[in-house]
Amino acid sequence: NGDRYWFDTRPTLRKTAQDRATQVAEADVIEEIESRLKKLRREEPFAGLHVCPASSLDVPDEQAARLVILRTEDTHRANAGASAAITAAENILNNHGSKPRTYRNMLAFVAPDQEAMLSLRQAVRDFRAWRSIQDDKETLNLDAAQNKEVDANLHRCNDTVEARIKETYCWLLTPEIDCFVDMKTIQWDASRISGGTDSIVAKASRKMQQSETLITKWAPALLLMELNNVLWKDTDCIQIKKLWEYLCTYCYLPRLAKYSVLEDAIRTGLNSQEYFALAAGYTGDRYVELRYNQFVDCINTSDLLVKLDPARKQLLAEKSAPAVVVQPTQTAQGGEQPTLFNLPPDAPIDPTVILHQPPTAQPAAVPAQP
């Protein structure tokens, strides 16, 4: 005070905050982090966001892409073949409660970094300490200057916690299988999504789309490549419903965000001569309502994708089938009216109906010269 000094018998606010930070319970630290994470919102193209699930049952087993934010203790570190994060992710990937998970290719995970988690926990303790001082300002009998100091430190610590959460939850874990090496063993791709001001969910979405580990637009050529590699190697067709189930289930196949991505790829491919055909069904020897090289608006999950070679052969045979005439019937004027049909060679014919080849047209007589 001017040129005079004195000793205050009360500890400084900073010393009080440091002492209180050491007394913050671990459970309170975890609760603070998870409560902030649970404010995250789902973003496209994810159909669901699941923050710190207590068990695998908390993550639905459905045919749509979902992002799982792992718990604070499920940490990962660089170049780690095994970690608490991978163990937790594998449990959710393989199980849905007490049952095996079916649609495993629909999940991706974000995990915290092991080293960064230590800094985050300390930042949370500091924040909790300053908040407790603010809550006790009446008991501590703080003056105006001290209240201003508390508010400033609380605001600073809050910003630090928010920034540290984004820095800490930086590992994107996606399951994959190399079908040319081992069709059963899951490998985990771990990539960093740190940096930037976007949310954890937005960064994960952007990273997955850039790396094509989550596909929102699929070219028909890539769909045909997957069909030829695995899905219809030993058959000429595949049901669309079954194809979509395969894509949702097996981690060696591309991960599509939702069914409409597959539907759009099929529709684009059908409007071309290069990829595949579509049929409403198969009778055992021919495809029903076979179409290709045309725009198809309505695609049903019960429809079949058909290889081009058998599709072209059937369409060519149907096109070259001879016209046939059913036994003439009486018209309203008493005359006879033949009915023409273009039937495929193998079409079943009612034996009670008499079929005739249409008569060959005769050239008209040339009139005599006068």
Language-model-detected regions and their locations in the chain:
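Extended alpha-helical scaffold and adjacent linker segments that couple domains
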Residues: 1-370
